[in-house]
Amino acid sequence: MDINLFDFHLPEELIAQVPLEERETSRLMVLDRETGDIEHKHFTDILSYLHEGDCLVLNETKVMPARLHGVKEDTGAHIEVLLLKQEEGDKWETLVKPAKRVKEGTVISFGEGKLKATCTGTADQGGRQLEFSYDGIFYEILDELGEMPLPPYIKETLEDRDRYQTVYAKEIGSAAAPTAGLHFTEELLEKLKQKGVELAFITLHVGLGTFRPVSADTIEEHHMHAEYYHMSEETAALLNRVKENGGRIITVGTTSTRTLETIATDHDGKLCAASGWTDIFMYPGYEFKAIDGLITNFHLPKSTLIMLVSAFANRDNVLHAYNEAVKEKYRFFSFGDAMFVASHAKMGNK
């Protein structure tokens, strides 16, 4: 399948550069995955579309301030490091810029020596294995010295780093935020609970592969990056109870979707406690096994994320919805507006 089938025209001014002042004031497009019907709403209207007995699945990963600026100890040359994945102990898989300056044995100093890293291995596309040394607690030092690793299409400085975290972020480990969750406030989540909507939490640590473009000409040639996920016994039991009682499982974001669909795929359609690495790739033709609805932001043209949404709601429906979003001047990408995709015609809104 040609990746150009997932292209659409997006004016640059529709790429949201900063978050809205209030999280829940973003707009919400409601898309019926079967009929393609569209409604234009505000995010707080999600209350009308979720019902008692439904369950929202939220990714409680927390973004690390994973971008570090340091200097080479021998020359003083500036080096930028992006933490991707913790390996064993203090060894990390990272991206460095400029990569040609960092070879095995290179020592980089951050924060006037508060944190040091030695290159212990090299990989393609600027990848480097670094081993860190420090006094104290690594994540406290990272919190002091690191910056939030905003996506490459965001050029503005983020004034408040909490705005690139969900209000329920808990498990540190992501290089990017699960952005569909950024629209929820604690008050909105409380109102949903009062209505009888269940909240379930999983963890998937988002990797930088999220922003890597599909370089192959056809979808089938593309290989997904692997990301770590975890679902507890408590969450699995809740989701199975919701299903047994006829409720809907609504994932908040593509990361929650990938987690549930990975587990269901690996366990004959069943949801159970599990953890591991997933490189699941969902595109048209994929049959969903776990979810009934999806809340997600508006994604990049030709990205694996728009392919996932197209697998769930039909490519023609999704591209029509995206073209409507452009016409109606919705805000796109990480700090943009949201879409709620489900079989709304069957449920109506209450």
Curated annotation (Swiss-Prot):
Broad class of the protein's primary localization: cytoplasm
One cellular component GO annotation, for this chain's record? cytoplasm
- Tell me the Pfam families matching this sequence: Queuosine_synth
**Subcellular location(s) per record:** Cytoplasm
Note the superkingdom of the native organism.
Bacteria
Q: Which GO terms describe its biological process?
A: queuosine biosynthetic process; tRNA wobble guanine modification
Top EC class per UniProt? transferase
Q: Which pathway is this protein assigned to?
A: tRNA modification; tRNA-queuosine biosynthesis
Reaction catalysis annotation: 7-aminomethyl-7-carbaguanosine(34) in tRNA + S-adenosyl-L-methionine = epoxyqueuosine(34) in tRNA + adenine + L-methionine + 2 H(+)
Q: What's its EC? A: 2.4.99.17
- Subunit annotation: Monomer.
Q: Which family does it belong to?
A: Belongs to the QueA family.
Q: What does this protein do, in the record's words?
A: Transfers and isomerizes the ribose moiety from AdoMet to the 7-aminomethyl group of 7-deazaguanine (preQ1-tRNA) to give epoxyqueuosine (oQ-tRNA).
- What protein does this entry describe? S-adenosylmethionine:tRNA ribosyltransferase-isomerase
Q: Which organism is it from?
A: Bacillus anthracis
